[in-house]
């Protein structure tokens, strides 16, 4: 049964950098949405002390929600093996965090697209690191889900495996059972490629999804690509309300349903306010009901 989660995209700096919002405040706010769970980010200030993990889990479950997904951003493509080992160690900590919170999916990435790292080396570095983490994740009941990613909020370079061919080669290279794809259609558009073509290539490996829509405030995709090497997201890029951007959710959900997708869809939206996030929830609920059946049109938490 597909379920709907939300990610605190609009509140990342408040929760990760400034500490001007507590995790409990986000949980209580998100609980007013018609969703089934929450996706957390590993950099949340309130999660850095493992003694606070039970508190975060209880606060979420008290609202009738779960924390199925953890958004982690390991950087596995650095040429220094010591750096990569440090990233593996961090990923294992995040896997422990995921399991302690009751989650079953912890994101992995390839890493940053550093100009000095070749395609072959980057794929090898990332694959080795992910395969090193996979048995540890399995011991904790966690599946590693790699996202076709654009860029972490706090990275300098864009994702090494941003382009479809590189991403698919990396996914194909990794054969461990507790590994799959976290599909994000918007990120494919940012790579100048077709999200439906990517979905067709990886649909049998998709275990979770990031629901988002993107628009360019000004300029073109080509202009955006010129700005990739600045820290954070390019300023001309905008997360929009889902259903009002460039993604065809009827085609996306139809494809996912055709392969028996039965997992979590996490909303990455709301940067223009909480009402925008509410609108995205309403849109996705309508589409879930349309494609999977009327029972998926609500979480029933507020019944």
Where are the model-predicted features located?
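Histidine-acidic metal/acid-base catalytic patches
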Residues: 1-34, 161-303
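Active-site-proximal loop/turn and secondary-structure-junction residues that shape catalytic pockets
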Residues: 10-12, 42-44, 73-76, 110-114, ...
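Conserved beta-strand positions in the central sheet of alpha/beta enzyme cores
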Residues: 39, 69-71, 107, 145, ...
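Short Asp/Glu-rich motifs
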Residues: 49-50, 79-80, 117-118, 156, ...
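Surface-exposed cleft-lining segments at the edges of enzyme active sites
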Residues: 80-81, 112-123, 150-159, 239
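Active-site groove signature of glycoside hydrolases
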Residues: 98-119, 140-153, 266-267
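Basic- and aromatic-lined ligand-binding clefts that recognize polyanionic substrates
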Residues: 139-175
